[in-house]
Amino acid sequence: MLTVVYGHPYDKSFNAAIKDAILAALAKEGPEWSLIDLYADGFDPAVRAPELALYSQGRTSDALAQKYMDILSRTDKIIYIFPVWWGTEPAIVKGFHDKVLLKGFAWTYSPEGRLMPKLKIRRTVLFTTSEAPTATFSAYFTHYLPEHVFAAVGMQGAAWHNFDHIPRSTPEERAAFLKLAAREAAALIK
């Protein structure tokens, strides 16, 4: 199953347009897919003391986090859509990682103490937007996140597409990026 993780609060944003283009492409293809809309779901990204007490057991007291874990356990391809804020993912996406990618669920340790991924996600694709040039964030999104977060939990095959200079973009540039997003999503589901 393909899962889309969406992390933007404003329904008139370009991120919303990216989400809509991707969901329209997925709907045409028909196979099973799922949307995790973090803001619409009311997801709380903060890890509270009761959740932290369960963390080492790979459990959560957050019903939404558990729902997301159930979805990810059936996911073999994942698409993220979010803006780049302060050079990284928004807090709600970081909180998704903190609260959902738990030890025992998404990763564990080998008897020798090595990190062992547990998820079976073959493709991970990110669509982001930014005001600054893509090169500004390249090291984080092409190296750190794929190698130290995604690979650690079993999210493989990471690809990143960033639409930069968002305030100065033309309608033609936006339309081209939406087509790219729809094409990528359709190719993933086939």
Show where each model-derived region lies.
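Residues at the starts of beta-strands that form the adenosine-phosphate
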Residues: M1, E32-S34, R122-T124, Q156-G157
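Short, structurally constrained coil/turn elements
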Residues: A27-E29, K120, G154
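Hydrophobic residues at beta-strand termini and immediately following loops
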Residues: I36, F127, H161-F163
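Structured loop/turn residues at beta-strand edges in well-structured enzyme cores
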Residues: S73, A91, L119-R122, Q156
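Glycine-rich phosphate/pyrophosphate-binding loop and the adjoining helix
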Residues: T136, H143-K190
